[in-house]
């Protein structure tokens, strides 16, 4: 598995979130198996998204396919993106 963490600023969180939700088809198309959305504590328009993929190819293909949609839903500037290979995952209750 692979994880991608992306951080970017948006014009208005509510507009971005609607567009993000409507692009569910794109996430499914590229094999995203898990997603979580986070906001910077002091700036709700500073977004961090975590996506897990079946493999690194899906993650990189997704990043290449997403830019047109990102502009439409209000992403400002270039995002910061990190890729990682999943080594271990533990759930605590």
Segments (PLM) and residue ranges:
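Short, surface-exposed ligand-recognition loops at beta-strand->loop->(often short) alpha-helix junctions
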Residues: 9-19
């Amino acid at each position: 598995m692979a994880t991608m963490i992306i951080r970017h600023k948006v014009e208005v969180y509510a507009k971005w979130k609607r567009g993000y939700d409507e692009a569910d088809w794109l996430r499914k198309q590229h094999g995203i198996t898990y997603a979580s959305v986070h906001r910077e504590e002091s700036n709700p328009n500073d977004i961090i998204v975590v996506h897990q993929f079946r493999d690194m190819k899906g993650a990189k293909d997704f990043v290449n396919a997403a830019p047109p949609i990102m502009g439409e839903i209000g992403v400002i500037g270039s995002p910061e993106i990190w890729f990682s290979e999943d080594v271990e995952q533990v759930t605590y209750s």
